[in-house]
């Protein structure tokens, strides 16, 4: 959005959260020698100062239609809701020359018995509760994963002073990315036990681990729904074990995790390259590339091993 805005294009930035910025609001990665949330604030401040930019938080883009038309539902702020003269919700019809989807990806769970007990959460949710809201979801936290992102949760929880009991990774051929935490490689959770909430987990080797919170990460599925509204057909990405957008409309591009790109460095570079091409085709001036010193996030995932 910032690259396009600096080039002089009229921008509408739609985000379903009440704070713009996506997952950067709950991460601890470094950008240009500072935490990503600080970098995000500077970007948003610049966007707010530009007259050619319209920011629309609390807004869900629900439909992609012919001729670059999109449907969006905006939920007004609580202050507006308390005023009878103003609407609580607004239905928008947006006409665009081009759209860039940065809708991210949803984390997958992993199946095991009683995996719906209270206290069992997706790994990224646990991490964001800690980083964004300062909330500890449990006193003795375990992590069950088949990818590197589960270890990122362990790293952030440990940094915040949480007690990470154990990491169970389905993969057996990896070097643990985080040190000084008990871990089991090539292991699987068979069953969760508890009454009102989880109290322990049983592994396939017979070991029982006492825990009051289990963070689960089974990889990510890109949010590609809007790319399918005009006959787009997703294709399978074997490396990241997920479906990615394919056969996009001519006036649509997908960037970042929504396109199956999970490395932050590749994400920034991919965004810059695609936006430069889009702006050139639309007749806007070229903007000088901005250098980013960003923490490299390694993302490797393996399917559930066959026994």
Please state what every model-predicted region is.
Residues 1-307:
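Residues forming the flavin
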């Amino acid at each position: 959005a910032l690259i396009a805005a600096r080039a002089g294009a009229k921008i509408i930035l739609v985000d379903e959260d009440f704070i713009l910025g996506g997952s950067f609001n709950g991460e601890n990665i470094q950008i240009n020698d500072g935490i990503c949330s600080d970098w995000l604030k500077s970007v948003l401040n610049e966007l707010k100062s530009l007259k050619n930019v319209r920011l629309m938080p609390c807004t869900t883009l629900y439909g992609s239609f012919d001729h670059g038309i999109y449907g969006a539902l905006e939920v007004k702020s609580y202050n507006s809701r308390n005023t009878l003269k103003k609407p609580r919700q607004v239905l928008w019809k947006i006409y665009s020359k081009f759209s860039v989807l940065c809708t991210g990806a949803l984390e997958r769970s992993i199946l095991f018995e009683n995996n719906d007990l209270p206290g069992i959460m997706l790994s990224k949710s646990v991490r964001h509760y800690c980083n964004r809201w300062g909330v500890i979801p449990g006193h003795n936290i375990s992590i069950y994963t088949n990818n590197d992102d589960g270890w990122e949760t362990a790293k952030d929880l440990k940094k915040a002073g949480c007690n990470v009991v154990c990491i169970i990774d389905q993969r057996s051929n990896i070097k643990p990315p985080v040190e000084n935490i008990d871990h089991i490689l090539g292991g699987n959770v068979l069953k969760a036990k508890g009454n009102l909430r989880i109290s322990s987990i049983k592994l396939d080797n017979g070991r029982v681990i006492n825990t009051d919170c289990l963070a689960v990460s089974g990889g990510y599925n890109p949010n590609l729904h809007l790319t399918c509204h005009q006959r787009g057909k997703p294709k399978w990405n074997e490396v990241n074990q997920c479906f990615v957008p394919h056969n996009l409309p001519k006036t649509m591009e997908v960037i970042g995790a929504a396109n199956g790109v999970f490395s932050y460095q590749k994400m920034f570079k991919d965004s810059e390259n695609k936006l430069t091409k889009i702006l050139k085709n639309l007749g806007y001036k070229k903007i000088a590339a901005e250098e980013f010193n960003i923490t490299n996030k390694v993302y490797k995932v393996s399917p559930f091993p066959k026994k």
